Amino acid sequence: MKVHIQQLLEQAIVCLIKQEIIPADIQPRINIDRTKDKSHGDYANNLALMLAKPAKQNPRHLAELIIANIPESTLVIKMEIAGPGFINFFINPNFLEKQIDGAYLDKRLNVQIEANPQTIVIDYSSPNLAKEMHVGHLRSSIIGDAVARTLEFKGNNVVRQNHVGDWGTQFGMLLAYMEELRAKGEPIENNLANLEIFYRAAKGRFDESEDFATRARHLVVKLQGGNKDCLKLWAKFNETSLSHCQETYQRLGVSLTRADVRGESSYNDQLAVVVEDLDKQGLLQQSQGAKCVFLDNFKNKEGDPLPVIIQKKDGGFLYATSDLAAMRYRQNELNADRILYFVDARQGLHFQQVFEVARSAGFVNEKTSLEHMPFGTVMGEDGRPFKTRSGAVAKLADLLTEAEVRAYELVKEKNKEMSEPELRHIASVVGISSVKYADLSKNRTSDYTFSFDSMLSFEGNTAPYLLYAYTRVVSIFNKAGIEMGSVTAAVSLTQEKEIDLANKLIQFNDIIDQVAKQGMPHFLCSYLFELAGLFSSFYEACPILIAETETQKQSRLKLAGLTAKTLKQGLSLLGINTLERM
């Protein structure tokens, strides 16, 4: 809808340039906003205010000229000027009706494919394989996945990259412990069943025994040198750890697969090449024995350029080195147009610096967009980063299990006659969806409080509320005895609540565009919540199955059907499955 209005305004600007009312070199960015007050129309624009100064015109007078030069369209029934020069657009109900009829028949619900699809690389989840996935991995995994699904739905070629931490000094400690177990004749597989216990045991040995710590350091050197025995143990550990990750992804409904894994170790043979390239270009400087790139745009308190360390004094490499190698791979091998990083906000400076080094070195093209998509912290109800009652970092698998158990009790209370298998299935969907939606519905840049009571509520902007809203529409069609997609009559919008619902339904394309461009799934969550609320108001004010006429009944069934389809598609893009009944 916004695109249609934007096109009308663009045509008006062309006319005004020809009339020499607006300077020919003006290329304004046209923003279309939803109005909050329906008396001011459906959409508003501040174009006249933006162009008034360069056009040397009074804003309200310029708004009149813009309106006069907008071509006739079935889209708009009238336009009004408000305040200092805002242009308000009132959408024609007849246009709405045609849009609803079209969306109902369209599998894509009128969501447009990108005119110029891109190859978009998305780096998300990326856990450290030394430990089990914990609550800190939740946000990157599900926010990144929702954006990946949305960009794919828009027709882009999305390449998922799970940049797991499968290399580094901590693996020397783990290998040393694996060697100890093997020497004792203990099966390594049994000990790897619980990665967290295994890691703590290895860390305990490392801290308490200098001999163990020395062996661990030697094993890191052997591993990095390609020692076959070390690599074999390392591969065994990674295989087990990746299997744990994949189980969690499947439970979470995250679309990452083993084929998407490209860990730090996959760039090992490119790290020295990165250093050599930077050196050849004269970008490297020695600082206290380390090789660094100094960036003029990043300075300390004294005004001196900050270093990005590329290679340590002892010859070791850092995250910056592997990130630069990954960027070159993603540019040269994957031909990325955009590279998105869903990583904690605390890594903001790191990415700003690495992006600048990559551009300075020509590792990425000028047109390639490098975007850090930061997110905040999951907090406990005590206002501190979320932990278990014992103070330990909460395992993601344990959180999901607790969510399912709590959801089971809620569902069982409401459906005492339901069979056990169905109860378990519904509880699993409700529990997992609640954890995901509680996160996705928050602006990703903000911290949020993790609360089972809030996320499992059937009131407010929650997964249970939206899942129930969907089942409510399903039950209407069940009572009517017809399939949801079988309504053939045209929509007729005569009541205020019908028009309100229709207006919201045709915004779906705009919302999907917004999520795709900004990487913000909470926009979609807010839209779905508002849509469910408007459907509830429509349902109360406009009887469907007992409508006054058959024509009215069919029209309202179509509105209800499109609402359900939109809820289902929207939730699917968030990685959430719907239920036929709750």
Curated annotation (Swiss-Prot):
User: Which regions form coiled coils?
Assistant: none
**EC numbers for this chain:** 6.1.1.19
Kindly give the NCBIfam families that the UniProt entry links to this protein.
Answer: argS
Q: What is this protein called?
A: Arginine--tRNA ligase
Keywords attached to this Swiss-Prot or TrEMBL record, sorted alphabetically, are: Aminoacyl-tRNA synthetase, ATP-binding, Cytoplasm, Ligase, Nucleotide-binding, Protein biosynthesis
Q: Pinpoint motif 'HIGH' region by residue range.
A: 127-137
- Lineage start: Bacteria, Pseudomonadati, Pseudomonadota, Gammaproteobacteria, Alteromonadales
Q: Which domain of life is it from?
A: Bacteria
Query: Got a GO cellular component term for this one?
Result: cytoplasm
Principal location class = cytoplasm
User: Which species is listed as the source?
Assistant: Psychromonas ingrahamii (strain DSM 17664 / CCUG 51855 / 37)
**InterPro entries recorded for this chain?**
aa-tRNA-synth_I_CS, Arg-tRNA-ligase, Arg-tRNA-synth_N, Arg-tRNA-synth_N_sf, ArgRS_core, DALR_anticod-bd, Rossmann-like_a/b/a_fold, tRNAsynth_Ia_anticodon-bd
Q: What's an example of a GO molecular-function annotation for this chain?
A: arginine-tRNA ligase activity
The gene name reads: argS
Q: Which family does it belong to?
A: Belongs to the class-I aminoacyl-tRNA synthetase family.
State the reactions this protein catalyses.
Answer: tRNA(Arg) + L-arginine + ATP = L-arginyl-tRNA(Arg) + AMP + diphosphate
Q: Give the enzyme's main class according to its UniProt record, as a single word.
A: ligase
List where in the cell it is found. Cytoplasm
Q: How does it assemble?
A: Monomer.
- HAMAP family given in the database record: Arg_tRNA_synth (MF_00123)
